[in-house]
From Swiss-Prot:
Keywords: Acyltransferase, Cytoplasm, Transferase. The active site is at 171 (acyl-thioester intermediate). InterPro entries: aa-tRNA-synth_II/BPL/LPL (IPR045864), BPL_LPL_catalytic (IPR004143), Octanoyltransferase (IPR000544), Octanoyltransferase_CS (IPR020605). GO terms for cellular component: cytoplasm. It comes from Leptospira interrogans serogroup Icterohaemorrhagiae serovar Lai (strain 56601). Residues 24-212 form the BPL/LPL catalytic domain. Gene3D superfamilies: Bira Bifunctional Protein, Domain 2. Pathway: Protein modification; protein lipoylation via endogenous pathway; protein N(6)-(lipoyl)lysine from octanoyl-[acyl-carrier-protein]: step 1/2. It is found in: Cytoplasm. Catalyzes the transfer of endogenously produced octanoic acid from octanoyl-acyl-carrier-protein onto the lipoyl domains of lipoate-dependent enzymes. Lipoyl-ACP can also act as a substrate although octanoyl-ACP is likely to be the physiological substrate. This is Octanoyltransferase. Its EC number is 2.3.1.181. It comes from the Bacteria. In the reaction, the free carboxyl group of octanoic acid is attached via an amide linkage to the epsilon-amino group of a specific lysine residue of lipoyl domains of lipoate-dependent enzymes.
Length: 216
């Protein structure tokens, strides 16, 4: 399996094309990247959770796309670290539950190691929240398991300004419940981003086979 870190923003539609090719050939790969301001609706989206008209989004330069991942509406924007994980569960004989639990555990352990920040999950509302204030969400998750090959993944709010979230009720919740490392007053510099990615690689390798690393 490869890990690829993109330093440039990747258009959301380009990612959708990439993940379809990866699934077609069942080619495992983990991607770290950022998107330009984008809103996506998952297979369980509620139209009422889109708070503005598509015409307004277009005028603000915000793209909107409908996807086959789980969940409702979420937002992507510069400064948010996105981790897309493409894993062949059938080949690895892994259950969906095991995969999800360990994906979230990898993020929890990595964030704790990087900032000494404690996060918790919520079985009733997927994602990761502050242990000190469970109403505050810092990480979204949405995964597609078509043909037992995963795509999509997690979006962690690092230094993004959260403005795009104001256009939606993220996963059915008020956008004011969203937070970021920057908003919490922690160091969000490039070196901390790199440290987080390094920790994520290590923790992902704890439940997946060794990964070959490349950059783009």
């Amino acid at each position: 399996m490869k890990i690829i870190e993109f330093r440039k923003k990747i258009p959301y539609l380009r990612y959708l094309e990439m993940q379809e090719k990866l699934r077609k050939f069942r080619k495992e790969c983990i991607l770290f990247l950022e998107h330009a301001p984008t809103i996506t609706g998952g297979i369980n989206y509620n139209p009422e959770n889109l708070l503005v008209k598509p015409e307004f989004l277009e005028s603000m330069g915000i793209q909107i796309h409908w996807t086959q991942r789980g969940g409702d509406f979420t937002a992507h924007e510069p400064g948010q670290l996105v981790l897309y994980s493409h894993v062949d569960l059938k080949k690895r004989n892994l259950s969906i539950r095991f995969y999800l639990e360990n994906l979230l555990r990898s993020v929890i352990d990595s964030v704790r190691s990087t900032w000494d920040l404690q996060l918790i999950s919520d079985s009733d509302s997927p994602g990761l929240y502050l242990e000190s204030n469970p109403s505050q969400k810092i990480c979204s998750i949405g995964v597609n398991f078509k043909s037992f090959f995963t795509s999509h993944g997690i979006a962690f709010n690092l230094s993004n300004d959260l403005k795009t979230f104001r256009c939606i009720n993220p996963c059915g919740r008020n956008w004011t419940n969203m937070t970021s490392v920057k908003d919490l007053g922690f160091d969000f510099g490039l070196h901390k981003r790199d440290e987080l990615i390094s920790c994520l690689k290590k923790n992902l390798c704890s439940f997946l086979e060794p990964i070959n690393v490349s950059s783009s």
